[in-house]
Amino acid sequence: KGYQYLPVVLKVIAMTTIKNVSEHQAGICVTMSVKLPAILTRQLAQTSCPSLPDPMNRYGYLAPQYGGLRIRACPSGTIYSENQCRYKSNMNGNGGLRGSARKQFRQCSAEFKINFDDGFKDISKGGLAFDYSHISLRRGKGVFVGNSKLYIWGFQSRFLGKTFAIRMKVKIKRGAGKYRPEPIISNCGPNGDSSVEIVVHRGKVIFKAKTSDNPEAVFITEDYDDDKWTDLTYYYDGNHFGGSCNGRPFRQRTGGNLEIRDNPMTIGLCTGQNGFHGEIDELEIYTACIPKDM
């Protein structure tokens, strides 16, 4: 705290916008200037996009966080597009997908995937930072007991835009959410209400999406069976918010971008709420594509 790291990839920004940082200081910790947030604000306001291209790495981008910039990686098979303010498929000079990227997109790869078979391991190639607490393992399942949570830091301050999807398999314990909502997955937290969320409350699974074109969030409510495995899907494609609960599909028209939250994507627990009681077998999160079977 009180310091801001300026890595080498930010050298162009540091040298041209912060007068008290010299060339030899790029890449070391320097005392943070109060001018930095204003500089970032101007940089981002020029495009109305909540992220900036990484001048040294087309496979990543820069996102504001805690008054500074954080380097984010694009999903495998994609590059960052400043014009589109999001990932796009990695095209070669002839306008076609490279072989590896073509395979990635045909398969629609998840950016984060965990199934608890090998413990707490992200088995995707997304490389997102995450952490967990108070989750136990039972026969390849994650057991959540009310104070358990897994939080994915890679989604903090993340631009989700018009392409986002979740697939998960859960077993909701009888009585879960009887008195207060229990979040299964959400970008809830102290820095704003959630824009993406699946919770259990009073015998229902409730799906939520908050987009930039709508003043009110969209909520969809579905039934489920206690103590039985439930397949959940959630997607937003820029025009519709949809998903399914045990194969029963839902879809509602909406528009705009999923709103950004300066919170990590959290599984199992939100600040000030009851935590989830149940088990999770699989969790997949997609940001570059939506699987065709959703």
From Swiss-Prot:
Q: Where in the cell is it found?
A: Secreted
Top-rank taxon, per record: Eukaryota
The record's Gene3D superfamilies line, in alphabetical order, gives: 2.60.120.200
State where it is primarily located.
Answer: secreted
Q: Does the keyword Secreted apply?
A: yes
Cellular component terms per the entry's GO annotation: extracellular region
Q: Where, by tissue, is this protein expressed?
A: Component of the organic matrix of calcified shell layers like nacre and prisms.
Q: Output the InterPro entries linked to this UniProt entry.
A: ConA-like_dom_sf
Q: Which UniProt keywords apply?
A: Secreted
Under which name does UniProt file this protein?
Shell matrix protein
In its UniProt entry, the species of origin is given as: Mytilus californianus (California mussel)
